[in-house]
Amino acid sequence: MNYEQVREADPAIAAALADERDRQEDTLAMIASENHVSEAVLQAQSSELTNKYAEGYPGERYYAGCGPADDVEELAIERAEELWGAEHINVQPHSGTQANMAVYLAMLEPGDRILSLELEHGGHLSHGHPANFTGQTYEVEQYEVDPETGYIDYDELHEQAEAFEPDIIVSGYSAYPREVEFERIQEAADAVDAYHLADIAHITGLVAAGVHQSPVGVADFVTGSTHKTIRAGRGGIVMCDEEYADDIDAAVFPGAQGGPLMHNVAGKAVGFKEALQPEFEQYAQQVIDNAEALGERLQEHGFSLVSGGTDNHLVLVDLRESHPDTSGTVAEEALEAAGIVLNKNTVPGETRSAFNPSGIRAGTPALTTRGFDEQACERVADIIANVIDNPDDEGTIDEAAAEVDALCEEYPLYQGESGITDFE
């Protein structure tokens, strides 16, 4: 984007924005929750809608002058309904966490019970962690993945639900590399008369493209982020059956938020339209193919993957066996110095702290947006392996950085008519 006016008004911010643009162009984004939106989405999110308050919903606003805002939100809803097939969709949440908050506010009372996946096993802060409002407001018990396989043990989850009797069971995760069997979790919820919240923040795009099974029509509530694998404007979304529509809408506004960020809603609408194009299905499948190629190549280098591989957009690497003296933090910092940006991550059975854990998480959505295929991701895996094998060797880091530079030049950002790399 052109920051000419920002440069005139605020050179310091303009410099930071330019630095971020250059950073994204010149490094490989492998944080599994990140992606590169199109220039069309960027423009929509920087539109004059940022000036407009639009409290309420289309046709029922608390302020005048909301005609264009109504048009934008209605288009976002219509496109979301076409993508995911839910009976009712609210596109106003500012984030995936606030989408989850809306469900809790709508359906639970303080002290009610939540059953969710343990954070170090791949869950999320907003699913009941003590540092989050959920852990401070509700009674939370958490399930874990099988320590031997790294998979969710659905039979064990069912038994745990019967013993705990939760009011809501949360599925959907931030660091779980396998396909989620939503129907199995729904069976556990039905057995104890609990609600089922499926948080698909990481896999919204995979679900929309049909390359991951959908919880819509299975779970009572489906929430997600709109800027990860779906590659739309930043924010959140809530989906539910029509019977819960009024409760959810009231929980979003005025329960959890005031005016929606209408410029972000515009970005959502544009991104949803892009995701309705045939090439998006090819993109989503390529994300998975790339993650599989990345993981398999890392295994060839001797790395251990949680669950032994991946079915989705991410791999979770457990360094304890292959590199017992190298923490996820050391690996993250060495890789960033080489131009590969991923994140340290806890692993099941974690023996270190969350700030210096034993694993790293790597995702392929942003690489795939740049046009990476399986062979390119294998090259990335080779670089990752070499750096982690030699995290303190400056020569290794310099060599890796040169390889990353070559990949960034080979697969530049914002190519093609849609503003992202086109897939034929």
From Swiss-Prot:
- Which residue numbers mark the site Plays an important role in substrate specificity? H227
What are the annotated disulfide bridges? none
- Pfam families of this UniProt entry? SHMT
Query: Where does this protein act, in terms of pathway?
Result: One-carbon metabolism; tetrahydrofolate interconversion; Amino-acid biosynthesis; glycine biosynthesis; glycine from L-serine: step 1/1
The record lists the catalysed reaction(s) as: (6R)-5,10-methylene-5,6,7,8-tetrahydrofolate + glycine + H2O = (6S)-5,6,7,8-tetrahydrofolate + L-serine
Q: Which GO terms describe its molecular function?
A: glycine hydroxymethyltransferase activity; pyridoxal phosphate binding
User: Cross-referenced SUPFAM superfamilies, in alphabetical order?
Assistant: PLP-dependent transferases
InterPro entries in the cross-refs: PyrdxlP-dep_Trfase, PyrdxlP-dep_Trfase_major, PyrdxlP-dep_Trfase_small, Ser_HO-MeTrfase, Ser_HO-MeTrfase-like, Ser_HO-MeTrfase_PLP_BS, SHMT-like_dom
Record localization: Cytoplasm
Q: What is its EC number?
A: 2.1.2.1
Provide this UniProt record's keywords sorted from A to Z.
Answer: Amino-acid biosynthesis, Cytoplasm, One-carbon metabolism, Pyridoxal phosphate, Transferase
- N6-(pyridoxal phosphate)lysine occurs at which residues? K228
Q: Which PANTHER family match?
A: SERINE HYDROXYMETHYLTRANSFERASE, SERINE HYDROXYMETHYLTRANSFERASE 1
Q: What does this protein do?
A: Catalyzes the reversible interconversion of serine and glycine with tetrahydrofolate (THF) serving as the one-carbon carrier. Also exhibits THF-independent aldolase activity toward beta-hydroxyamino acids, producing glycine and aldehydes, via a retro-aldol mechanism.
Q: Which family does it belong to?
A: Belongs to the SHMT family.
UniProt name for this protein? Serine hydroxymethyltransferase
Q: Which organism is it from?
A: Natronomonas pharaonis (strain ATCC 35678 / DSM 2160 / CIP 103997 / JCM 8858 / NBRC 14720 / NCIMB 2260 / Gabara) (Halobacterium pharaonis)
